[in-house]
Amino acid sequence: MVKAIWAMDQNGLIGNGNSLPWRIKAELQHFRQTTLHQDVLMGSATYLSLPPVFSERNVYILTRNLNFNPPDKGCLTKVIHEYENFIQPYLHHPDKHLYICGGAQVYEQLIPRCDALIVSTIFGKYTGDKYLKVDFSPFELTKEISFAEFKVAYYHKIAR
């Protein structure tokens, strides 16, 4: 399954420069637990913004830069330059998961292809420059979990 995972505030804000506009430990733990030991796909700017150690994941970096050489962050990395063929083995596969982890351009390209979405909504409004507008109509809300500072909504694509 191809799943997009992200956090946003109540206005759809997902970033400020190349960082998160908030620092919520429980939400970061949710992201870590969900993606640990999994395959993740992200853009090069998102990869470069990660902490120095981002281990225990297979990271695929989507970039148009044919000369991109990712710095070592303690994880297996592979650079890819197109996503359509890459995501095929994951699509609709119940036991093989690929998590789409940003940034905004990668989400915009891949959310329509996703089997599922995992969306953390941070309570409150923050300042930043990266917003994500998502058409949720192809998806059905299947579960929602509330925490003190955010809630997590799980969506699955509606079979057509």
Curated annotation (Swiss-Prot):
NADP(+) binds at residues 6-7, 14-19, 43-46, 62-65, 101-106. GO terms for biological process: dihydrofolate metabolic process; folic acid metabolic process; one-carbon metabolic process; tetrahydrofolate biosynthetic process. InterPro entries: DHFR (IPR012259), DHFR-like_dom_sf (IPR024072), DHFR_CS (IPR017925), DHFR_dom (IPR001796). Pathway: Cofactor biosynthesis; tetrahydrofolate biosynthesis; 5,6,7,8-tetrahydrofolate from 7,8-dihydrofolate: step 1/1. Keywords: NADP, One-carbon metabolism, Oxidoreductase. Gene3D superfamilies: Dihydrofolate Reductase, subunit A (3.40.430.10). Substrate binds at residues 5-7, 27, 32, 57, 120. One of its GO terms (cellular component) is cytosol. Key enzyme in folate metabolism. Catalyzes an essential reaction for de novo glycine and purine synthesis, and for DNA precursor synthesis. This is Dihydrofolate reductase. It comes from Mycoplasma pneumoniae (strain ATCC 29342 / M129 / Subtype 1). The lineage of its organism: Bacteria, Bacillati, Mycoplasmatota, Mycoplasmoidales, Mycoplasmoidaceae.
